[in-house]
Amino acid sequence: MSATDLASLEKTIEAAFDNRDNVNMSTKGEVRDAVEAALNLLDEGKARVAERGADGVWTVNQWLKKAVLLSFRLNDMQVVKGGSGNSTWWDKVPSKFENWGENQFRASGFRAVPNCVVRRSAYIAPNAILMPSFVNLGAYVGEGTMVDTWATVGSCAQIGKHVHLSGGVGIGGVLEPMQAGPTIIEDNCFIGARSEVVEGCIIREGSVLGMGVYIGKSTKIVDRATGEVMYGEVPPYSVVVAGSMASANATMANGLPAPHLYCAVIVKRVDEQTRSKTGINELLRD
């Protein structure tokens, strides 16, 4: 699709979103066609909710998020087939794999293990592996990435190339508020089991999160070497574990020591060469 066509599509969706109270299941024509076209672009990886520039800055294509939201107003509930024992579901969003056969799976180039769930408009790149997991609409999963068992990739989340999302990992989805950016895991990251990254936070390239690390916008991310405290973004090639910090007030009103509060701790930073040659377990050793 040309830049002119994309601009026209964006204009139509922006206008429809501004007038969304009048968009419903009976809406036909240009608006419905534009939303369908946008969802197809997302589904095929030809457009992304967020894109990383050469300077490392992520730009959010809000109009694509708006297209996803408009689709809920346009589409009725329907039976979704494919459940265990010929059971069905009841939803507005069909499976990405609806009506797929061998040819479509071979062309896609990724592995989809039984009981993984991918909703339409999520893109899965070649050589990715989906264990029994959940990938929500508008998400992007990069080439060679492993989405392990019971991991969840939220709506519009952006997962880079050669990422490992370990068992039970949760990557938060962000559709609303509209101005919020999606949660982003950049290339070559390892996210340890049962960790959570939410609220539009960014884990920069090559970083390693140990098991059970929770990062949201209000989570303190502390560099142990410098004492620097940051929020919302883990720097490139950081090794991060769960920790705690002393409270600002050393004691409570009753005189007892104040409880320490959770934080994420950067225990070390490594360069790209070290990261590529060093095992994950070795990096996480103190």
Curated annotation (Swiss-Prot):
<dbReference type="InterPro" id="IPR001451">
    <property type="entry name" value="Hexapep"/>
</dbReference>
<dbReference type="InterPro" id="IPR018357">
    <property type="entry name" value="Hexapep_transf_CS"/>
</dbReference>
<feature type="binding site">
    <location>
        <position position="111"/>
    </location>
    <ligand>
        <name>substrate</name>
    </ligand>
</feature>
<protein>
    <recommendedName>
        <fullName>2,3,4,5-tetrahydropyridine-2,6-dicarboxylate N-succinyltransferase</fullName>
        <ecNumber>2.3.1.117</ecNumber>
    </recommendedName>
</protein>
<dbReference type="GO" id="GO:0008666">
    <property type="term" value="F:2,3,4,5-tetrahydropyridine-2,6-dicarboxylate N-succinyltransferase activity"/>
</dbReference>
<keyword id="KW-0963">Cytoplasm</keyword>
<keyword id="KW-0457">Lysine biosynthesis</keyword>
<comment type="pathway">
    <text>Amino-acid biosynthesis; L-lysine biosynthesis via DAP pathway; LL-2,6-diaminopimelate from (S)-tetrahydrodipicolinate (succinylase route): step 1/3.</text>
</comment>
<dbReference type="InterPro" id="IPR050179">
    <property type="entry name" value="Trans_hexapeptide_repeat"/>
</dbReference>
<dbReference type="InterPro" id="IPR005664">
    <property type="entry name" value="DapD_Trfase_Hexpep_rpt_fam"/>
</dbReference>
<keyword id="KW-0677">Repeat</keyword>
<keyword id="KW-0028">Amino-acid biosynthesis</keyword>
<dbReference type="GO" id="GO:0005737">
    <property type="term" value="C:cytoplasm"/>
</dbReference>
<comment type="subunit">
    <text>Homotrimer.</text>
</comment>
<dbReference type="InterPro" id="IPR011004">
    <property type="entry name" value="Trimer_LpxA-like_sf"/>
</dbReference>
<dbReference type="InterPro" id="IPR023180">
    <property type="entry name" value="THP_succinylTrfase_dom1"/>
</dbReference>
<keyword id="KW-0808">Transferase</keyword>
<keyword id="KW-0012">Acyltransferase</keyword>
<dbReference type="GO" id="GO:0009089">
    <property type="term" value="P:lysine biosynthetic process via diaminopimelate"/>
</dbReference>
<comment type="similarity">
    <text>Belongs to the transferase hexapeptide repeat family.</text>
</comment>
<feature type="binding site">
    <location>
        <position position="148"/>
    </location>
    <ligand>
        <name>substrate</name>
    </ligand>
</feature>
<dbReference type="GO" id="GO:0019877">
    <property type="term" value="P:diaminopimelate biosynthetic process"/>
</dbReference>
<dbReference type="Pfam" id="PF14602">
    <property type="entry name" value="Hexapep_2"/>
</dbReference>
<keyword id="KW-0220">Diaminopimelate biosynthesis</keyword>
<dbReference type="Pfam" id="PF14805">
    <property type="entry name" value="THDPS_N_2"/>
</dbReference>
<dbReference type="InterPro" id="IPR037133">
    <property type="entry name" value="THP_succinylTrfase_N_sf"/>
</dbReference>
